[in-house]
């Protein structure tokens, strides 16, 4: 189960599914945007989910060469490619679309694309995560808190 998205703010159910799959021994990998991003605040807000995912066995890769604006997923022979960022904004509020396919040649092409991108990414592990500088931790806390506040406010409007 490999997932690529530039804005990683998944819903609780998506995070739970990723953790459960990884804890069962499945190869769960996230390909996320690295330091070159158009919305640093969103990147920092999404970092709050890293520790639990890493402890569950999810592998997290941050793409280094440029801004990653890729949105795709592959699970076995199933592929999803499109405009949905797989975050709580797109899954709850925005109108986005993906195309899904069960097509072995397409799956092979998507897997090859993922493998090329993983090779150009920095893998985040728990040791790396715990060694990050204080200023980054502060940014992650602030943006994570603001994101949670906005989502909770918008959820109450329904």
For each predicted feature, which ranges?
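PLD/PLD-like phosphodiesterase catalytic module centered on the HKD motif
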Residues: 2-158
């Amino acid at each position: 189960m490999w997932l690529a998205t530039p804005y990683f703010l998944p819903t609780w159910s998506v995070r739970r599914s990723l953790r459960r799959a990884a804890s069962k021994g499945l190869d769960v990998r996230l390909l996320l945007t690295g330091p070159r991003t158009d919305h640093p605040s969103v990147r920092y807000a999404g970092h709050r989910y890293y520790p639990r995912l890493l402890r569950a066995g999810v592998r997290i890769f941050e793409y280094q060469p440029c801004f990653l604006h890729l949105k795709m997923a592959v699970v076995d022979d199933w592929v999803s490619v499109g405009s949905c960022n797989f975050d709580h904004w797109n899954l709850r509020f925005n109108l986005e679309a993906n195309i899904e396919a069960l097509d072995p040649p397409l799956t092979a092409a998507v897997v090859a694309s993922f493998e090329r991108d993983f090779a150009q990414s920095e893998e985040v592990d728990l040791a790396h995560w715990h060694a990050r500088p204080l200023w980054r931790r502060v940014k992650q806390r602030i943006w994570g808190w603001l994101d949670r506040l906005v989502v909770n406010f918008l959820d109450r409007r329904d």
